[in-house]
């Protein structure tokens, strides 16, 4: 039965949210321009009521879509495309924003929340700010309308409540069965089945939403000709946006580090770049806004940068969702036909902001004060310029597909390709920009706080410089000791190392002074120390990352494989230890993850059923000394996830186990995810490059032998013994009838490092003979009880073999990567301290009636 009601309800909420947003924008516009207090109050109240209606409708849309996903209503295209009935609940949440419609909805939700916060905290600016807010919400709501205009072959938006049959109307099944409902959905992308994907997108979209607030205040300031006053209420929100958007970017990097297998945390993917660039410009805007607050300079620059940030957010949305990136990004959505609508959205606010700024430009106050080279304003300007250049370099190359489209649109011909080596291309530029930013953040702080004269520069910087020099020399010697003399030949690496150390040292001195006098002012110094540590961590973990899984056997794994494959990977046969990076490394076998209880299960210990998610325990299953299941228990597993147990043993005998994962999704293919051994000084990062697929390996023709009880024999060169044969009255959870006969053999197989018990079964049922073989997966052998010879007390066994289980592993050491993570924590802490200070400052002005 098709559940029409919930889809119709959701669609009703979509239309209501769109209409209410338009009504709110109109009412707030009228209220802002009203000449009488009575009309202003009337229209503002109408705007507020309309926006609350809009927000309630957005929540209604969210609830409706969650109901469809959670109840597995696969008659709806959205639920069918991105979920299945076996997904854990927390990944069902990820399904919500996996598609374009859901991510637009998430963006709308956060902006609705922020709009309500502004309505309740800032009555002075409510009218003009909420006009912009509501207008943006109307554009976003239009993206999920899914309405075809009467008389036009044009659809506005793409609805998350469309039925599968409406999208796949040409499918034969819907021709014969219009009400057909699939029993299962396509499932969630394996790479998104990660806990970071539950929290990273909401954080990132909250960052997107927060950039609207300073943009709205800036537009409101231009609109009302309150050119100076908008900065104070906008600054805390800019800091909030910088913190949240930065946190979202960092979460994405950490997700990539833990989930993808390229060995890093930033791949310079076009969509990563399209978020990174607005964040850079937002940081630049924060600095110019702070400069204006303190010296009334850089007001125009602040306006330009704040507007640019929001426009870049819209541009990144266009890049991601229009399909223009094609295959150049792993993050981009498929084109839902919204490219024209997205372009209108972008151009409306771009040209609207430009026109308003041009009209008001001459009225915007400026200062005639000459900026000295030794003034803080000068150094802020230089830093802002460098940040903008960093963003410009990245966005120009990222936008190559856009430039091609524009040239082709005007009759030209262009097929420029994005950089083949993205990491190398962007890094060679961003490295030098980062060095300059680090040095400026060190030196600029002294000009900001100390207001030093030219003759005092050397004195103020001497201690931080000498401290940095000493630490730098020590670390260079550590590099030579650890990586050899070649490690210091890259001048860029050495410069970024010194710049990072100098940033920490110089800002540390500033921080020490501020903590004694004014702790509330320390946010900038803390954030800059974090930036310095991040640069040091990036330099070590990326520049001095080392592959440790080298093939030292002198043998090729495969003549068809690349030189890199044969050189940089380690072949591990099961239970055969090898040496690697000061460890004894041993592959212990593949494992499955139990669904109901936290733990891994050895496939040797379970029987698979017709349902790939359900298995039966052959014996008591124990993991980490905890009994998970009893023999013959039926329980659920995650069949898509296969983990490979890699045991590391240090020189002191200490053991650590890694579980790198392969996800095999029937629709989306295989995806490898690493596991990481974390130490204070470095990470050991390992993932599976290749493996022996037991499903594809062919069994040899069975060798038949006759044995008696307790007789030893060889099973594929492994000493084995038939210990006993006993009658059984059930096979797994299935009870046998009294007329059935089943016997189970107990065969002990001695592997090189471990003993195994094989239990093949011989069944006579309804005068039919059946045989259930037993596979010892670790050894690549299969034993079958072929026949019973009561006259001689012998048993016929069939022995088959195939390739012994193995994996090919790639492992890397990431030195001092924890310095990077510590730096990110300090950056976020610095943002938090600065934000609290600006909020308190704003509240004090509110209490005085000045806001």
Region spans (language model):
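Solvent-exposed, non-transmembrane regions of integral membrane proteins
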Residues: 1-851
């Amino acid at each position: 039965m098709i559940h029409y009601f919930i889809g119709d309800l959701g669609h009703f909420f979509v239309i209501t949210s769109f209409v209410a947003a338009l009504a709110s924008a109109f009412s707030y516009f009228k209220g802002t321009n009203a000449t009488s207090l009575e009309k202003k109050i009337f229209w503002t109240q109408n705007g507020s009521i309309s926006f609350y209606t809009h927000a309630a409708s957005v929540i209604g849309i969210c609830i409706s879509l969650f109901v469809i996903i959670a109840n597995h209503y696969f008659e709806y295209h959205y639920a069918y495309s991105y979920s299945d009935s076996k997904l854990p609940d927390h990944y069902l949440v990820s399904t919500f924003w996996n598609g374009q419609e859901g991510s637009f909805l998430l963006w709308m939700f956060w902006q609705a929340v922020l709009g309500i916060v502004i309505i309740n905290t800032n009555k002075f600016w409510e009218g003009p700010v909420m006009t912009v807010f509501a207008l943006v919400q109307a554009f976003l709501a239009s993206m999920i309308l899914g309405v075809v205009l009467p008389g036009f072959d044009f659809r506005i938006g793409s609805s998350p409540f469309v039925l599968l049959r409406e999208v796949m109307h040409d499918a034969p099944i819907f021709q014969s069965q219009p009400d057909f409902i699939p029993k299962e959905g396509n499932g969630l992308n394996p790479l998104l089945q990660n806990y970071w994907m539950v929290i990273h997108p909401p954080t990132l979209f909250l960052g997107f939403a927060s950039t609207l607030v300073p943009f709205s205040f800036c537009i409101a300031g231009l609109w009302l000709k309150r050119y100076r006053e908008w900065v104070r209420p906008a600054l805390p929100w800019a800091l909030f946006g910088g913190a949240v958007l930065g946190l979202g970017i960092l979460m994405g990097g950490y997700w990539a580090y833990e989930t993808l297998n390229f060995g890093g945390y930033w791949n310079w993917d076009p969509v990563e770049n399209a978020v990174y660039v607005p964040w850079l410009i937002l940081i630049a805007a924060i600095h110019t806004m702070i400069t204006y607050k303190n010296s009334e300079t850089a007001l125009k620059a602040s306006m330009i940068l704040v507007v640019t940030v929001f426009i870049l957010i819209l541009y990144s949305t266009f890049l991601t969702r229009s399909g223009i990136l094609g295959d150049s990004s792993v993050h981009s959505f498929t084109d839902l036909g919204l490219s024209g609508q997205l372009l209108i959205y972008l151009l409306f606010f771009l040209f609207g902001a430009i026109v308003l700024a041009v009209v008001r430009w001459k009225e915007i106050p400026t200062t005639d004060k000459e900026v000295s080279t030794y003034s803080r304003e000068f150094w802020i300007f230089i830093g802002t310029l460098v940040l903008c250049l960093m963003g410009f370099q990245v966005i120009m190359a990222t936008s190559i597909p856009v430039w091609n489209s524009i040239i082709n649109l005007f009759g030209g011909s262009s097929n420029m390709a994005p950089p083949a080596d993205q990491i190398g291309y962007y890094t060679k530029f961003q490295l030098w920009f980062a060095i300059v930013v680090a040095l400026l953040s060190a030196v600029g702080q002294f000009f900001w706080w100390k207001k030093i004269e030219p003759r005092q520069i050397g004195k103020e910087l001497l201690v931080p410089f000498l401290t940095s020099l000493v630490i730098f020399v020590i670390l260079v010697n550590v590099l030579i000791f650890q990586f050899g003399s070649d490690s210091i030949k890259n001048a860029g690496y050495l410069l970024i190392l010194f710049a990072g150390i100098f940033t920490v040292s110089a800002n540390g001195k500033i921080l020490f002074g501020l903590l004694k006098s004014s702790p509330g002012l320390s946010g900038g110094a803390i954030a800059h120390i974090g930036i310095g540590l991040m640069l040091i961590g990036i330099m070590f973990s990326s520049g001095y990352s080392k592959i440790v899984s080298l093939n030292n056997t002198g043998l090729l794994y495969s003549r068809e494989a690349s030189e890199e494959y044969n050189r940089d990977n380690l072949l591990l046969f099961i239970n055969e230890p090898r040496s690697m990076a000061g460890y004894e490394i041993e592959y212990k076998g593949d494992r499955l993850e139990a669904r109901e209880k936290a733990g891994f299960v050895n496939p040797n210990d379970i029987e698979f059923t017709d349902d790939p998610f359900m298995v039966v325990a052959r014996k008591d299953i124990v993991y980490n000394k905890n009994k998970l299941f009893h023999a013959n228990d039926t329980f659920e597993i995650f069949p898509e996830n296969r983990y490979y147990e890699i045991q590391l043993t240090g020189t002191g005998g200490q053991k650590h186990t890694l579980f790198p994962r392969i996800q095999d999704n029937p629709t989306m293919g295989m995806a490898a995810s690493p596991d990481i051994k974390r130490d204070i000084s470095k990470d050991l990062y390992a993932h599976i490059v290749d493996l022996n697929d037991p499903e594809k390996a062919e069994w040899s023709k069975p060798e038949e032998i006759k044995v008696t009880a307790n007789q030893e024999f060889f099973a594929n060169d492994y000493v084995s013994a038939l210990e006993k044969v006993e009658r059984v009255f059930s096979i797994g959870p299935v009870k046998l009838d009294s007329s059935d006969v089943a016997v189970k053999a107990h065969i002990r197989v001695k592997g090189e490092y471990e003993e195994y018990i094989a239990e093949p079964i011989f069944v006579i049922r309804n005068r039919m003979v059946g045989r259930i073989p037993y596979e010892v997966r670790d050894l690549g052998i299969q034993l079958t009880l072929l026949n019973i010879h009561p006259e001689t007390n012998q048993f016929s066994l069939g022995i088959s073999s195939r390739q012994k289980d193995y994996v090919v592993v790639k492992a890397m050491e990431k030195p001092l990567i924890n310095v990077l993570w510590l730096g990110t924590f300090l950056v976020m802490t610095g943002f938090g301290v600065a934000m609290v200070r600006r909020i308190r400052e704003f509240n004090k002005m509110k209490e005085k009636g000045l806001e």
